[in-house]
Amino acid sequence: MRASSLDELGQLCRGIQRAFVHLETRDSYGTETELPHLARWRRGEPDDYGWLGWWLEMLRGHRTAGRTCRRVRVVSEPLSKYQQWVLSFADLFAEAGEDIRYIPRPRLTTTPLPGSGDFYVFDGNLVMFLHYAGNGTNTAFEITDEPQAARACQEAFESVWHMAIPLREYRPA
């Protein structure tokens, strides 16, 4: 395991050969990029989503090349304001090629998940763990290519994926 960074996360997402999967387990995040847009949404102001351009373009490129990008959001219901906000524009991600599913937290009561919570698995063999402070800000990124960790995270993701609700069918409680 070694320390990593947000820049490396972006490079890994862009550089996949086959696929990435992403498990999100928090009800709220506080990234510097997102906070101003979340604040605007809370005030009822429009957003042109230009700040998502690079991500959406990357997803389109992966889809065109036949690569897959999947995400599961583990959520508490009723949804937090943050989760309401990201759900309000999740269709942009889906239209660009990311397959997103939601799973209410109680459905995972007996499902073992890695203790760090959020992670990405790239091409089935490289894992990045994302660590957060209580207020949702990133505190650290760690990466490993240890086969046992990659296998455990991929299997955990797949078990959650099969129970999760596709974006187009998800209706929050």
Regions flagged by a language model, labelled:
Residues 1-173:
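PLD/PLD-like phosphodiesterase catalytic module centered on the HKD motif
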